[in-house]
Amino acid sequence: MVRKIFQTNAELKDWLSEQNSAIIFIPTMGGLHPGHQYLIQKAKERKTNTNQIILVSIFVNPLQFSKGEDFKKYPRNINRDAELAFSAGADAIWAPDYDEVFPGGADSHFKIEVPKTLHNQLCGAERKGHFDGVATVIIRLIKIIKPKKLVLGEKDWQQLIIIRKLFQELSIPVKIESYSTQRDQSGFAYSSRNSYLSDSERVNAQSLPNAIKEAKTEFDKGKVINLTKIASIFKENNLKIEYLKIVDPFSLKETENINRLCLLAVAVKCGSTRLIDHTFLMHRKPIIAIDGPAGAGKSTVTKAFAKKLGFIYLDTGAMYRAVTWLIISNSIDPNDQVEIKNILKDSKLEFKSSSFVEQKIFINNIDVTEKIRSPKVTSMVSEIAKQQFVRELLTRKQQVIGNNGGLVAEGRDIGTAVFPDADLKIFLTASPTERAKRRALDLHKRGYEFSSIEDLEKEIKERDKKDSERKIAPLKKAQDAIELVTDGMNIEDVLKELIDIFRSKIPEEVWPTPNS
């Protein structure tokens, strides 16, 4: 493909009409640096097919600059920017003039007003109307380009949160993909405004990333972050603090709940140059809880999700099935709690795997991976799972496995009982009819006979009733869970939806997507 630079809407639209391709759009204001190049490189790496084009825009948006800010001074060098963009993998560049983006002037077009609860935090507290200008221009660019995907950096975290919220509320059908802050060898976050710094200012400004890195290191050791100490370091290096806060990464409001994902956010002035930086604070790796009724496809999808994102996969349903199989194989009455306690007390339950795909479950060194999927186990597992001793035993085992995080678990009470502090909770469900069809396919594939889909649907409804009405850890959607109804969706569709939800809650900086 011949690399192109367009300056008018007409040129761009003519070219787009010839491509018949999905557009991956990366908006910039120019002044490109390795951070921008990283976004382009990642967008290229994660193309889902060859029929996708990476378009980079270069437009210094006057609406996001207040009076007295650096609009006129902002770096502009289209030739250098084009060279950096193309070398990173961009297919085309759109560098429009103001009149191309706002024909007749900005006053001739609708403007977006960001909710004050989001705008007036952090950067927006000092930069009045800044994010209104950002949101307005993004909508204009999206309207002109009509991309399938928008790629943004996590360095401008507040901007990312606002744009995600904007797209969600306006139901804009564009996927947002974000990537972590990139830094030079000294740890300094790349920014177009870094070029403003004199040599001596650059030395002073180095205390910004150094202090943030040290604070995160102390936090990871279990120590309390001392904001006063950080402020004194900045003062010693002639950095004027605009804000220095620990905030909730989504509401952007100050928080003292450091048991959840937090953001240490900083903005300082070094001379006349404004610099921002941040780091995420988390006591452990993320835990993802996926709950839902029988036959909703939890195991298949959760396993694929774990593989795609590099998580440990914990199939809690398989654990209950393994215990049920053990009880059946030893001819124990499912209501004889004394015998059940005795046999489980000395039993060894473990997962073994050489890969995510080949994960197997063993009980007392017997591979029961296939045995636990039999109709006999299926019909009895709910009776066994409702017993207090069984649930307490397996819940403890599950919590030990998830002690350090980095895990995705699926079951019926993961988000409510096993990991109530999970970082993301999904309630995956489908209609009983849909689940019966899936169950029939699964039984057929495994070589088991069944009477009819209608009977399977009846069994599923009975299982739902038992699971929902049991006194101990009943099946229910956690209050803070996101419900995903999967009727009519294939595994790939559900997986994509789950990953999008995950990325809206867990930044790349916290949990990077593994390279394929």
From Swiss-Prot:
Active site: 36 (proton donor)
Protein keywords: ATP-binding, Cytoplasm, Kinase, Ligase, Multifunctional enzyme, Nucleotide-binding, Pantothenate biosynthesis, Transferase
EC number: 6.3.2.1, 2.7.4.25
UniProt: ATP binding residues: 29-36, 153-156, 190-193
Cited InterPro entries: Cytidylate_kin (IPR003136), Cytidylate_kinase_dom (IPR011994), P-loop_NTPase (IPR027417), Pantoate_ligase (IPR003721), Pantoate_ligase/cytidylate_kin (IPR024894), Pantoate_ligase_C (IPR042176), Rossmann-like_a/b/a_fold (IPR014729)
Region listing for Pantoate--beta-alanine ligase, in residue ranges: 1-279
Record keyword Kinase present: yes
A GO cellular component annotation in the UniProt record: cytosol
Annotated catalysed reactions: (R)-pantoate + beta-alanine + ATP = (R)-pantothenate + AMP + diphosphate + H(+); CMP + ATP = CDP + ADP; dCMP + ATP = dCDP + ADP
Domain of life: Bacteria
Chain spans, region Cytidylate kinase: 280-516
Any GO molecular function: ATP binding
A GO biological process held by the record: pyrimidine nucleotide metabolic process
Pathway(s) this gene product operates in, as recorded in its UniProt entry: Cofactor biosynthesis; (R)-pantothenate biosynthesis; (R)-pantothenate from (R)-pantoate and beta-alanine: step 1/1
Family to which this protein belongs: In the N-terminal section; belongs to the pantothenate synthetase family.
PANTHER family: CYTIDYLATE KINASE, CYTIDYLATE KINASE/PANTOATE-BETA-ALANINE LIGASE
NCBIfam families to which the protein is assigned, alphabetical: cmk, panC, PRK13477.1
Record protein name field: Bifunctional pantoate ligase/cytidylate kinase
